[in-house]
Amino acid sequence: MARTPVSEVMTRSVVYLPGETTLDEAAQVMRDRQIGDVVVTHGPTMAGLVTDRDIVVRAIAEGLPPQSTTIESIASREMIMVEQSATVEEAVQAMRERGVRRLLVCDADRKLVGIVSLSDLAMLPTSLVNSADQRQ
């Protein structure tokens, strides 16, 4: 199981929102779709990633008004990707090294096909997670 590819545990339904979307609109989309992140777009390109935690920590806690603050203004610009063939162990290692809770998952052509999060990994059997930890 330690060789499980991230494609087997990732979330496949990626939600894209334009950068001018407000925080309250993005939060409503996340709530309605039961997701914790959205990919921010600027025209046809990906401009960043915003998580539910970003909205709370980078915006609300800082006093930014959610009705007028855009997701582009708080988006993480550095989007860390792994290929869908990467193992869960490799994804865990990448998250640890980069201090992130989510990785974008791409195919061999670098097309986004999903997102793998700590929540996705938490759903794995304990034996798989322990196996990845022991190799660190």
Report the location of each language-model feature:
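Nucleotide phosphate-binding site architecture
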Residues: 7, 15, 24, 56-57, ...
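Short beta->alpha transition motifs characteristic of CBS
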Residues: 35, 39, 46-61, 100, ...
